[in-house]
Amino acid sequence: MRLKHNGRKSPIMNCSKRTDRKSILSPLIFRQQMILIQNLNQKLKTIKACLYQTWKLSRLKALYRSL
C-alpha cells in the first residue's frame, strides 16, 4: 500500500517542482528577451544610420557628376 501512496505522491511533487522552476525561470527569460530586443534595436539604429550615410554619399556623387 505504501508504494501506491508514494507513487501517487511523487507526480504531484514533480508537478510542483516543475512549476517552481518555471516561476523561477520566467523572469530570467523575460530579462534575456529584453536584453536581446535592446541589442537588436541598437543594431537596427546602426544599420539605419549606415543606410542614411550611403544615401547622402550617393546624392553627393550625383551632384558632382552633374557639375
Curated annotation (Swiss-Prot):
Taxonomic path: Viruses, Riboviria, Orthornavirae, Negarnaviricota, Haploviricotina
Record's protein name: Protein C'
Biological function: Seems to stimulates transcription by the viral polymerase. May play a role in viral pathogenesis or transmission by insects vectors.
Remaining remarks: The P gene has two overlapping open reading frames. One encodes the P protein and the other the C'/C proteins.
Family membership noted in the UniProt record: Belongs to the rhabdoviruses C protein family.
